[in-house]
Amino acid sequence: MRINPTTSGSGVSTLEKKTLGRIVQIIGPVLDVAFPPGKMPNIYNALVVKGRDTVGQQINVTCEVQQLLGNNRVRAVAMSATDGLMRGMEVIDTGAPLSVPVGGATLGRIFNVLGEPVDNLGPVDTRTTSPIHRSAPAFIQLDTKLSIFETGIKVVDLLAPYRRGGKIGLFGGAGVGKTVLIMELINNIAKAHGGVSVFGGVGERTREGNDLYMEMKESGVINEQNIAESKVALVHGQMNEPPGARMRVGLTALTMAEYFRDVNEQDVLLFIDNIFRFVQAGSEVSALLGRMPSAVGYQPTLSTEMGSLQERITSTKEGSITSIQAVYVPADDLTDPAPATTFAHLDATTVLSRGLAAKGIYPAVDPLDSTSTMLQPRIVGEEHYEIAQRVKQTSQRYKELQDIIAILGLDELSEEDRLTVARARKIERFLSQPFFVAEVFTGSPGKYVGLAETIRGFQLILSGELDGLPEQAFYLVGNIDEATAKAMNLEVESTLKK
């Protein structure tokens, strides 16, 4: 682990040897800077512009070198707004990539892309910093242990279980519940999980970031009385930030997580919401730099950029990073290059379906589209594997019969198919679950369901023991005992109405 104590976001001016350049062109967030011959900065070096604008306001803008243009000029992308910058202003080459604070000092705090705290709780100890650009761990350092990460969410644990130290993607279009699901996972895992978590808010809504912060303070994940005892560090580069900041904020969060893994030898949870915005910001920067766009207007370096980020998220012999990433799917098209490129890196995919969300089934996880490399008998056990396959087969058969039902009605089906449909509808409803983080909206208390309870519940539905219960009894409940209790209550209510 290379620690660089000389440069952090705000402390870059402490460098003794400064190379000065001058701005020669400004196009939005992109600056062209001229340097003296033989004093050219390297690619990814941090540049700092300091001075005053026309009304005397202090300016302090950090940029990152992206291209060497020739004629002693470089092209750099700004990490903050370029308002007030003028041609001829002095630019300092820090001589190193952007570095951010790492270690225990980051816990309980909110940072921007430069590693500067934005929570008004005072400065952060920056004695230990680390550059945001580094290579992925060598092949020989990797760890290949296989174990399941229990989430307490029935549909996930049964049909697409998560791997400890793996990469998980939550795929879905706009408004199907990706952020709510990621917040529930933080609630269930970060609280039960003894290690630390890092949350990277990449190009998402500022309101959601604020809600998450307030919720973490209420739940004790962030300890206001003693910040040092907090379990999470937050790094935000939201929708209103320039593309340079949104493109690099994921690396800032990852750098903090890597320190906990490599130096503190801890198991870390890394949440990224939303990895699509990382690609989107890269596409904007690519266009600003004048590169020819590739498929669907994305940057030609899409696979390289995604690979350089994802390959650093891995488990080594020192510790593990388990990463849970929300992936926005443009126009619900899973073949779009951004989600399609992300698919290749993941151990498990949780696909959210607009059809299920429209039916009011939350979490709206599609049981047939969601996959996991962990769903193998030798890893999860024969019973779990068999129940999961039977649930999928029943759901698949129901899907095939839906056209016939829509045209001819249920009565035209065979007795066997009618039974399959009845069980599939119970399964569909039993895959829904009340969330802790949605209590405020729904009014029903959240439920955590252990894996053994989940398997038992679906075993009873598939065996036919619960064929007599109404399907609404299975909707938004925790374990199967709650479903049978709800069925009894429904029966009592209907008797009283008569």
UniProtKB/Swiss-Prot annotation:
Subcellular location(s) of the protein: Plastid, Chloroplast thylakoid membrane
Example of a GO MF term: proton-transporting ATP synthase activity, rotational mechanism
Domain of life where this protein originates: Eukaryota
Assigned EC number: 7.1.2.2
Reaction equations catalysed: ATP + H2O + 4 H(+)(in) = ADP + phosphate + 5 H(+)(out)
Bilayer disposition of the protein: Peripheral membrane protein
Cystine pairings recorded for this chain: none
Gene3D superfamilies associated with the record: 2.40.10.170, Bovine Mitochondrial F1-atpase, Atp Synthase Beta Chain, Chain D, domain 3, P-loop containing nucleotide triphosphate hydrolases
Enzyme class, spelled out: translocase
Keyword Thylakoid (UniProt): yes
Residue numbers binding ATP: 172-179
GO CC entries: chloroplast thylakoid membrane; mitochondrion; proton-transporting ATP synthase complex
CDD domains for the chain: ATP-synt_F1_beta_C (cd18110), ATP-synt_F1_beta_N (cd18115), F1-ATPase_beta_CD (cd01133)
GO biological process, one term: proton motive force-driven mitochondrial ATP synthesis
Database matches in SUPFAM superfamilies: C-terminal domain of alpha and beta subunits of F1 ATP synthase, N-terminal domain of alpha and beta subunits of F1 ATP synthase, P-loop containing nucleoside triphosphate hydrolases
Keywords of the record: ATP synthesis, ATP-binding, CF(1), Chloroplast, Hydrogen ion transport, Ion transport, Membrane, Nucleotide-binding, Plastid, Thylakoid, Translocase, Transport
UniProt xrefs under Pfam families: ATP-synt_ab, ATP-synt_ab_N, ATP-synt_VA_C
Entry similarity comment: Belongs to the ATPase alpha/beta chains family.
Biological function: Produces ATP from ADP in the presence of a proton gradient across the membrane. The catalytic sites are hosted primarily by the beta subunits.
Quaternary state and interactors: F-type ATPases have 2 components, CF(1) - the catalytic core - and CF(0) - the membrane proton channel. CF(1) has five subunits: alpha(3), beta(3), gamma(1), delta(1), epsilon(1). CF(0) has four main subunits: a(1), b(1), b'(1) and c(9-12).
PANTHER family found in the cross-reference section: ATP SYNTHASE, ATP SYNTHASE SUBUNIT BETA, MITOCHONDRIAL
HAMAP family membership: ATP_synth_beta_bact
The protein, known as: ATP synthase subunit beta, chloroplastic
Organism: Calycanthus floridus (Eastern sweetshrub)
Gene symbol of the encoding locus: atpB
